[in-house]
Amino acid sequence: MAVRIEEVPVDDARAVALRGMLDDELTVRYGPVTTDEDPELTAARRAALRVHPDDVIATFLALDDDGTPLGHVMLRRLGADLELKRLIVPAAARRRGVGRALTTAVIERARAEGACRVVLQTGKPQPESIALYTAAGFTPIPVYEPYIASMPRSLCFELALAP
């Protein structure tokens, strides 16, 4: 099966649907927000995870031969850095190189934008993501803003890009 990467608008219906699938999967992996949690912490976490469309540089879909979406990723501006966000490859499409192809698309776009590095945030309940990012050359870094206060146990990574 060939995987084709296509850049789409951030509000592309297929991209929105895949981000919804990601939200559902992350709720299963991390658990739902409980009523016991401090509402200010919940609000801070939601704000940290929110991606404003104006900050998105590129949204990519991975498609199979017949155009069926296999995965999604975004690249956003975050201060002086570019951040890989919202990578999702549904379970049925995993182990086919889709995540690798999407990660490569983000890295290539970041280079074209003149970025010095790409950063990302993930967590222990996402071991497949950690393996993918490590295989792509990302290395661990300290938790960075906007995740420090609301998600201090995040696992963060960077990929330094050669000038």
Q: Which residues are covered by each model-predicted region?
A:
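Extreme N-terminal starter segment of soluble prokaryotic enzymes
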Residues: A2-R4
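Acetyl-CoA-dependent GNAT
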Residues: E6-K85, P90-A91, T103-A105, R109, ...
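C-terminal "cap" of GNAT-fold acetyltransferases
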Residues: V10-D11, M21, C116-V119, G123-P163
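Conserved G/P- and acidic residue-centered "switch" motifs that form tight phosphate/ATP-binding loops
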Residues: G97
